[in-house]
UniProtKB/Swiss-Prot annotation:
This is Major outer membrane lipoprotein Lpp. The lineage of its organism: Bacteria, Pseudomonadati, Pseudomonadota, Gammaproteobacteria, Enterobacterales. It is a lipid-anchor; Peptidoglycan-anchor. The gene is lpp. Sequence repeats lie at residues 24-34, 38-48. One of its GO terms (cellular component) is extracellular region. It holds the Pfam family LPP. Residues 27-75 form a coiled coil.
Length: 78
């Protein structure tokens, strides 16, 4: 039990020391990286939404073409 408390105390102390050693420049750089990644995610999301509408338009065109072909086949069978 005492060993567990000692290890836990060492982990907490180490975390505190590491947190105190981080510099504002590094935090600013990481914040900038996060903002850049968020912008890229937003752009990719917009691209996916644009592609979805293009895919739906292609599906609609294919359905209309298939319907026309079905109608032509019916007229030949008559």
């Amino acid at each position: 039990m005492n060993r567990t408390k000692l290890v836990l105390g060492a982990v907490i102390l180490g975390s505190t020391l590491l947190a105190g050693c981080s510099s504002n420049a590094k935090i600013d750089q990481l914040s900038s990286d996060v903002q850049t990644l968020n912008a890229k995610v937003d752009q990719l999301s917009n691209d996916v939404n644009a592609i979805r509408s293009d895919v739906q338009a292609a599906k609609d065109d294919a359905a209309r073409a298939n319907q026309r072909l079905d109608n032509q086949v019916r007229t030949y069978k008559k």
